[in-house]
């Protein structure tokens, strides 16, 4: 018989830097999960990624207080900011442009995020990433 699901917890945790402090501790503590066990497992799974990169994670908590988790790819906005070398997007994206990304960088980001994105082809995924870039005040160069 399958385990009974108690809750799903969605968090963004820095790769390789999960610790019991907020937001991880309170979110998992409410569900009765062993927080240190999650932190060790998450850090082990994300050790190959760049340290500090925010990684979305969905934690499935079961009625017997055990858990499983699925890590996703970093948000497109974070990858775009890293590619453009900027700290934050524009407050007025249509007026103030804050940086540039090339089509090759957009393709690379789309390929990185391919597993977590909808869209039939890499081109449709690239259009989605390019739209995110424009909404952040980045210019997409061909």
From Swiss-Prot:
SMART domains this protein is in? RL11
Any one GO BP annotation for this protein: translation
GO function terms (MF aspect): large ribosomal subunit rRNA binding; structural constituent of ribosome
Where does the signal peptide begin and end?
A: none
The record, for Pfam families, names: Ribosomal_L11 (PF00298), Ribosomal_L11_N (PF03946)
Question: Which residues span the membrane?
Answer: none
* UniProt PTM comment: One or more lysine residues are methylated.
SUPFAM superfamilies annotated for this entry?
A: Ribosomal L11/L12e N-terminal domain (SSF54747), Ribosomal protein L11, C-terminal domain (SSF46906)
Tell me the keywords, alphabetical order: Methylation, Ribonucleoprotein, Ribosomal protein, RNA-binding, rRNA-binding
The entry's cellular-component GO terms read: cytosolic large ribosomal subunit
Q: Which InterPro entries is this protein grouped with?
A: Ribosomal_uL11, Ribosomal_uL11_bac-typ, Ribosomal_uL11_C, Ribosomal_uL11_C_sf, Ribosomal_uL11_N, Ribosomal_uL11_N_sf
Query: Mind telling me which NCBIfam families this protein's record contains?
Result: L11_bact
Instruction: Spell out the subunit comment.
Output: Part of the ribosomal stalk of the 50S ribosomal subunit. Interacts with L10 and the large rRNA to form the base of the stalk. L10 forms an elongated spine to which L12 dimers bind in a sequential fashion forming a multimeric L10(L12)X complex.
Instruction: State the family it belongs to.
Output: Belongs to the universal ribosomal protein uL11 family.
Q: What does the record give as the function of this protein?
A: Forms part of the ribosomal stalk which helps the ribosome interact with GTP-bound translation factors.
Which protein are we looking at?
Answer: Large ribosomal subunit protein uL11
């Amino acid at each position: 018989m399958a385990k009974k699901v108690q809750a799903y917890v969605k968090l963004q945790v820095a790769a390789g830097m999960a610790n019991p402090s907020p937001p991880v501790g309170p979110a998992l503590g409410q569900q009765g999960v062993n927080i240190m066990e999650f932190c060790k497992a998450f850090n082990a799974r994300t050790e190959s990624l760049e340290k500090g990169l925010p990684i979305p994670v969905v934690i499935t908590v079961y009625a017997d207080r055990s858990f499983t988790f699925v890590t996703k790819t970093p948000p497109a906005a974070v990858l775009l900011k890293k590619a453009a070398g900027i700290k934050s997007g524009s407050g007025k994206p249509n007026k103030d442009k804050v940086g540039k990304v090339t089509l090759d960088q957009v393709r690379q980001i789309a390929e990185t995020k391919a597993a977590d994105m909808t869209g039939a082809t890499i081109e449709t995924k690239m259009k989605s990433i390019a739209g995110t870039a424009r909404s952040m005040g980045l210019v997409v160069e061909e």
